[in-house]
Amino acid sequence: MSWPPHVGALRFAIGDRVECSVYDSWKPGTVVCLMYRETEWPVGQTAPYQIKLDDTESLIYAPMDRNECIRRGPQAAEKQRDATPVTNPLELMKQRNTAMHSAASVARGREFTPRPMDVFIVTYPKCGTTWMTQVCHQVRTTRYLKGLLRANGKTTAEINAAFARAGPPTSDTQKDTAWSMRFGEITEVVPWDILASDCGQDLDAAQCINSPVLGKCSLSPRLFKSHETVGNIAPGGKYVCVVRDPADVFKSFFEFLPPYMGIPSGVITPEEFCDAIFAGASHSGDVWGHFRGWWDMGVDDDCEQSSMLFKNASDGDRNVFITSFEDMKNDLPTVVRRVGAFMKTEDDSGDLSEHDVTSVCEMCDFKFMRRNSEKFDDHFVRREMWRRIQIPEHEWAGGGVGKVREGGGGDLPESVREKIDEKWAEVMKPRGFPSYQDFRAAIEARNVRWDQK
């Protein structure tokens, strides 16, 4: 069901008679709960219903006991048209967000043993997770093809020359039909660590793409999507972290999470959402702590601090690479080169060629990803997740949530901006970063040092 713009929630007294929607058809005198699990909801708990009154759709809240519904005329309901908006959608969003993965699946995602060359894309939500996942996937598939040629006796120079002659994919058809895109949705080939078990994926299994020409292709390195903090991530692999201006993160998260949890747009205010996130509503913690944790785990190379948990066996290697969403927008080729160098496995020969970098950038272009949005919309994991939180199946078809966005902080309320800035000063300033721009500058300085090694 597509929900109309929110025009103000209404509260109805017990016994009021209204017209209520049974999904697409209107049936007078009935109430339909959008989320009802009798064994899990205590007596007296409230939950949302969709109603129709004078051709206006909105949300109301009524007792969970469906036997107590609506037996009287609409007069009392009419009187309460201007009632104070209820805030229960926020609680429903938090409840659903908490229930989106099973405890067993979370434990499996955090406790399995990665291979040393496995790469986790460990971003805070809305920092460019899907975009960086596509970058890493395109890097590994590019290297896979070159590895096949190398196995047939071709030298690196011969391989690069052959790729250069072919040219990068430029037409829509070339890109849409590329063998690297032979998946339904990208989490099928890049499992989400703490949701993989719920989705029937084995984190120890090979990650493969089937090609009509090449057959079954087992890709290396294996890639995993994650929003986990340093303290919760499965240790022993390699970790790519993307940071982003917290104001932009907040705006994008605010526009994304409620509909992702089946909550209509507009029923939660930016201020309410901000308070909830600050209070720990996100499974991933807060963005500031996430940034600081991954920055501190990446300082082994600076000799500032180290952790045996994340230290690679090779002293000359590193296993945490950090970049920014803004740098991906401003200079994607440089980010691709750095990702390629970071992801290099023992079987790889040489860095990515300029042709390789151009090809990867073509396949990670926003226009291309938007045109193929169904491959990047989480529908593979969302089907299972929505079953768990009991969002009605009839809503799935219209419930796609776009994940390819350029984003921007936009017109956030001043009170929200102040809270975001205050939190930065509390968490990041003591670490030596008075502002987000200072943090980005430090990340770039670190990456330049690695470029020169």
Task: Mark where each language-model region is.
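Short aromatic-glycine-enriched beta-strand elements
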Residues: 40-50
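Short, well-ordered loop/turn sites that connect or cap secondary structure elements
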Residues: 11-12, 26, 342
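Intrinsically disordered, low-complexity, charged/polar segments
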Residues: 3, 54-81
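The conserved 3'-phosphoadenosine-5'-phosphosulfate
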Residues: 144-208, 223, 315-410, 445-448
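Mixed-charge, Lys/Arg-rich low-complexity intrinsically disordered regions
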Residues: 1-18
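PAPS-dependent sulfotransferases, especially Golgi type II membrane carbohydrate sulfotransferases
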Residues: 81-118, 123-125, 210-211, 216-219, ...
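Conserved phosphate-donor/acceptor-positioning beta-strand/loop module used by diverse small-molecule
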Residues: 238-253
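Short beta-strand-centered aromatic/proline hotspots
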Residues: 27-36
